[in-house]
Amino acid sequence: MDRKSSVTIDLLRLGVMDTDAASANHHRIAENIGADPNRLADWEHHLETCCDPDLALNVLAELAQDSAQCLGEVLDHDASACRLVRLLGASSELGRHLIAHPDDLAEVIRDPVRLGHDEICDDLLEVVGAHKEGEFTVAGTPTGPASDRLRLANRRHLVRIASRDVSADDPTEIIEDVAAELADLADGIVTAALALARADCPDHADARLAIIAMGKCGAQELNYISDVDVMYVAEPANDDVSGASAVTIATKLAASVARMCSAHSGAGSIWQVDAALRPEGNAGPLVRTMDSMRTYYEKWAKNWEFQALLKARPMAGDLDLGQRFVEMVSPMVWQVGEAEGFVPETRAMRTRVVSLIAAKNKGREIKLGAGGLRDVEFTAQLLQLVHGRQDESLRVRATLPALRALAAGGYISRGAAERLKEAYRLERVMEHRVQMFRLRRTHLLPDDEDGLRRLARAVGLRTADEVRRVWTATSKAVLRAHGQVFYSPVVEAVARIPTQDLRMSAEAAKVRLSALGFHDEDAGLRHIEALTSGTSRAVRIQTALMPAMLAWLADGPSPDHGLLAFRQVSEALGESPWYLRALRDEGAMAQRLAVVLSTSRYAVDVLTRAPETVQVLVDDDLTPLSREDLARQMNAVARRHHDVEEAVGAIRAVRRRKLFRILVADILNVTGIRRIGQALTDLTGATIDAALTAVSREVEDAPPIGIVAMGRWGGQELSYASDADCLFVVGDGPGVGEKALKIVTKLRNLLGKHGADPAVVLDADLRPEGRSGPMVRSLESYRKYYGKWSSTWESQALLRASHGAGDRELTNELLEYVDQVRYPADGLTGSQLAEIRKLKARMESERIPRGVDPRRHLKLGPGGLSDIEWTAQIIQLQHAGHDPALRTTSTIDALNAALAAGYIDEGQHAKLCDSWLAASRLRNAIMVVRGRPSDVIPSDSTDLDVIAKASGMGQGASEHLVEDHLRHCRRASRVVDAVFWNQ
């Protein structure tokens, strides 16, 4: 056998199909780069692992003829030779680019690592000669030539990225990273195109333009060739420019960017920029202001539009403006899961997409077909939008991170998540390879043998039949997981319950959950499966408890949230012996846990941060502890720690348990609203007292410090969301103030920092001179200030002043002195009364958020908390100087004293007290249920139903809840008009 025949056989073994052409190309390459044509070069062994050896050899022969030196530099190194051979076998279009631009072979030689986002952007801006003009980046070269340079630079970066991609031993392992870098490249292209657009627009500096990436680009999971979905938001760059002018300018810029990215020239093209996802689609304006966007999404947007916004990301232009847009729409995105018809609409949309696939393409659609990429994406997005309302870990843009988060949160089984992730990675690699070949936008499997064989080799297979089999198996696996999660999953019912007659089929369990009042039966089944699968002791206890737990959870306002929380707490504590024993043996504990979990996100937040707090539920006596008992416990744990931070941490741990105890008593209706306010006041005072003692240990000769409680703390009326308003007072003496300030500063920092328990915020803004005044004052300083300079509003604020914490002698001395200020002997002058009324009116107009119905504002609305409190206080300021019975910090006690003295009649008293108590209960209930403070009654009917049921009003009583509040307020408002406003 001659050497030529030997080379041909070797090439055939490496996978070439046309041996004559391959042999001829081999000889052309060898002759041009000075190699031996009678034997295979070392680099040629890499043909075995490339997608199309014939194509690779053909392009290499062209390069050898025209750019032998450049090619030789690549082939001299095994790693770069491997990258080049694989690249040329995978992409005929990038091969043609390298023939025309051999200098870009340097991208194959370079170290195959991902470039940073800023590196790519800076490189592309340099390509167009961009520079800063004020705050804007503007290209410095003519648009035409610069546009072509940008197109060529895009190809250069694609050569670099694709070289890294195809040289990976397993491309599915880096697909996430490659897709993210392609999105970075898109950001850079659009950024450079915008710089070019600004160069052609003389008045560009009058408009801020944010370009928002949507779809795969927004999620940073972009393809090689894909439409880049965008939206445009604009604002005037300065006050002299109108919104309309800014939109006009920004529209020119946006259109120019789209043209540059989409246009074809001798240098090729980049990709289409598609703004069809914008409000009103192609029928709507290309660019909108932030206000216009907000109006559209608040009033007219459809559910699917919020699903699309899940992937919104600022990509170019004014990134701050873009981020503001994303933050503006984000709350709406995470509310759409509650929208009427959202789930059936999402399912119908997916079904419709599949039905529209052309018959000839069925079975070949990698993206849209049954079992394709879209099934994985829609599965993840549906679960994200349904459960992401309360679980922020699900608020991610990309599919793979979403699947990871869903599995971690228990919303999808780990096995299903792994199957979906594995399939998604493989299908994305397939999609990338069919696009890479000619750099054309396609999502179809090849329908020819050569194309299928090329794709097979790209994913580690050999033949067309193999890739067909893998595609079929993968799409079927996706369909199975998608069907279980997205539609109606069939899960073993309540697992293997020891009592035979409690064993149910999956459908029976689903029906039971629905009958009990659970809304998301599929999620419920997943949680039950997670808690009752296996053979461990913990599982046996959970399995025995599950039927009762489901019934107790269903009795609560939010069964679905309760079941999820029960799973989270159980997974955190399931192996703890005391928890298992309590679940099994303490029926009251299990029932209380169910009620708490299904009622209160606030309680769940405390529990999930510190699951051991659940031990509180074992205690039958939930009567709030006295301040003295709290102080003893806190001081005892603090003394066990020499380190001050550890001591305060231990104090806060006690507070966390006692706060949860108060919450439980509230949720179970063991304690009324006034007792809750007192309990929270005592807990806050004891916490601050113990922490002050601990922090003072650190300062030598620490001076006594008194803390005067103000506001709701001083009135013994704290709510769950209240800060601790206060004043800090020390005795007179040299150096006392400096030491006291050091102690107070550390005290506020240690109690105010975020931790497993809610922070205690010590707010001293009511101090003399407010924030501009000293944090700590001596007794004498307070006397001078209140004796000479205090304002009427400060006299009013002092009506709430009482001992809060620290040295009681100091606080008592200060309180005794300010009695003359807050209880003026002659009452209020006419001007003082007018001043108070004017301040009240201004607060109402300034502090009620725009767009909020004042009637739904619990604090500042007509007949709300502020109206009633100020009415009581104006009576105190007028008459407490000569009527000691009015000298109280409590609103209700002040109203009681006013009734006894005849300043209000029984009807007025009842209306004011009823409204104040009802509003206080409702404000606490909102915090308990939603886990976040709000002075506004929610407009969401789902939340209102939960709050109503948590308030003891029954299921579906949201309308009654609002009507009850409005009725109380109307009655109280009439009294306020008569007493406070004298109308």
UniProtKB/Swiss-Prot annotation:
Q: Which cysteines are joined by disulfide bonds?
A: none
Q: What does this protein do?
A: Involved in the regulation of glutamine synthetase GlnA, a key enzyme in the process to assimilate ammonia. When cellular nitrogen levels are high, the C-terminal adenylyl transferase (AT) inactivates GlnA by covalent transfer of an adenylyl group from ATP to specific tyrosine residue of GlnA, thus reducing its activity. Conversely, when nitrogen levels are low, the N-terminal adenylyl removase (AR) activates GlnA by removing the adenylyl group by phosphorolysis, increasing its activity.
Q: Which domain of life is it from?
A: Bacteria
Q: Which cofactors does the annotated protein need, by name?
A: Mg(2+)
Show the segment(s) annotated as Adenylyl removase: 1-490
**What GO annotations for molecular function exist for this entry?**
[glutamate-ammonia-ligase] adenylyltransferase activity; [glutamine synthetase]-adenylyl-L-tyrosine phosphorylase activity; ATP binding; magnesium ion binding
Adenylyl transferase: region residues: 496-983
Recorded family membership: Belongs to the GlnE family.
Its cellular-component GO annotations read: cytosol
The record's PANTHER family line, in alphabetical order, gives: BIFUNCTIONAL GLUTAMINE SYNTHETASE ADENYLYLTRANSFERASE_ADENYLYL-REMOVING ENZYME, GLUTAMINE SYNTHETASE ADENYLYLTRANSFERASE
Q: Which Pfam families match?
A: GlnD_UR_UTase, GlnE
Class of this enzyme? transferase
Enumerate the UniProt keywords alphabetically. ATP-binding, Magnesium, Multifunctional enzyme, Nucleotide-binding, Nucleotidyltransferase, Transferase
Quote the catalytic activity from the record.
Answer: [glutamine synthetase]-O(4)-(5'-adenylyl)-L-tyrosine + phosphate = [glutamine synthetase]-L-tyrosine + ADP; [glutamine synthetase]-L-tyrosine + ATP = [glutamine synthetase]-O(4)-(5'-adenylyl)-L-tyrosine + diphosphate
| GO BP: any one term | regulation of glutamine family amino acid metabolic process
**Protein name as annotated:** Bifunctional glutamine synthetase adenylyltransferase/adenylyl-removing enzyme
Q: What is its EC number?
A: 2.7.7.89, 2.7.7.42
NCBIfam families from the xrefs? PRK14109.1 (NF010707)
